[in-house]
Amino acid sequence: CVNIIPHMQSIYRWDGTIQQGKEALLIAKTRADKVHDLNARVRSLHSYDMPAILAIPLLHVDADFAKWLDENLG
Protein backbone atom coordinates (compact mmCIF):
# COMPACT_ATOMS: atom_id res chain seq x y z
CA CYS A 1 0.00 0.00 0.00
CA VAL A 2 1.59 3.26 -1.09
CA ASN A 3 0.66 6.91 -1.38
CA ILE A 4 2.40 9.13 -3.92
CA ILE A 5 2.31 12.86 -3.29
CA PRO A 6 3.52 14.58 -6.47
CA HIS A 7 4.82 18.08 -7.16
CA MET A 8 6.57 18.74 -3.86
CA GLN A 9 9.15 21.52 -3.69
CA SER A 10 12.45 20.18 -2.36
CA ILE A 11 15.38 22.29 -1.13
CA TYR A 12 18.62 20.60 -0.08
CA ARG A 13 22.42 20.87 -0.13
CA TRP A 14 24.20 18.67 -2.68
CA ASP A 15 27.82 18.87 -3.82
CA GLY A 16 28.33 21.99 -1.69
CA THR A 17 25.52 24.04 -3.22
CA ILE A 18 21.88 24.62 -2.40
CA GLN A 19 19.63 22.79 -4.85
CA GLN A 20 15.90 22.95 -5.35
CA GLY A 21 13.47 21.16 -7.57
CA LYS A 22 10.26 19.21 -7.83
CA GLU A 23 10.07 15.77 -6.26
CA ALA A 24 7.39 13.28 -5.31
CA LEU A 25 6.96 11.78 -1.84
CA LEU A 26 6.29 8.04 -1.63
CA ILE A 27 4.78 6.70 1.58
CA ALA A 28 4.91 2.91 1.67
CA LYS A 29 3.29 0.94 4.47
CA THR A 30 4.94 -2.34 5.40
CA ARG A 31 6.05 -4.43 8.35
CA ALA A 32 9.46 -4.24 10.02
CA ASP A 33 10.44 -7.61 8.54
CA LYS A 34 9.85 -6.25 5.01
CA VAL A 35 11.75 -2.94 5.35
CA HIS A 36 15.05 -4.29 3.98
CA ASP A 37 13.37 -5.65 0.83
CA LEU A 38 11.38 -2.45 0.33
CA ASN A 39 14.53 -0.34 0.74
CA ALA A 40 16.37 -2.42 -1.87
CA ARG A 41 13.47 -2.19 -4.32
CA VAL A 42 13.11 1.59 -3.99
CA ARG A 43 16.88 2.06 -4.44
CA SER A 44 16.83 -0.11 -7.58
CA LEU A 45 14.06 2.01 -9.13
CA HIS A 46 15.12 5.48 -7.96
CA SER A 47 17.02 7.89 -10.22
CA TYR A 48 19.01 9.44 -7.34
CA ASP A 49 22.40 8.13 -6.21
CA MET A 50 21.28 8.54 -2.59
CA PRO A 51 17.50 8.61 -2.21
CA ALA A 52 16.13 9.59 1.20
CA ILE A 53 14.59 6.32 2.37
CA LEU A 54 13.34 6.44 5.96
CA ALA A 55 11.64 3.88 8.18
CA ILE A 56 9.53 5.55 10.84
CA PRO A 57 8.38 3.57 13.89
CA LEU A 58 4.69 3.91 14.67
CA LEU A 59 3.08 4.51 18.04
CA HIS A 60 -0.23 3.03 16.96
CA VAL A 61 -1.67 1.10 14.01
CA ASP A 62 -5.40 0.53 13.73
CA ALA A 63 -6.08 -3.19 14.29
CA ASP A 64 -8.20 -3.56 11.15
CA PHE A 65 -5.53 -1.93 8.99
CA ALA A 66 -2.77 -4.05 10.56
CA LYS A 67 -4.79 -7.20 9.81
CA TRP A 68 -5.37 -6.10 6.21
CA LEU A 69 -1.67 -5.28 5.79
CA ASP A 70 -0.60 -8.68 7.14
CA GLU A 71 -3.05 -10.46 4.84
CA ASN A 72 -1.75 -8.58 1.81
CA LEU A 73 1.98 -8.75 2.53
CA GLY A 74 1.98 -12.52 2.79
Where are these regions (language model features)?
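Positively charged, small/polar-rich N-terminal and surface patches that mediate targeting and assembly
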Residues: 1-74
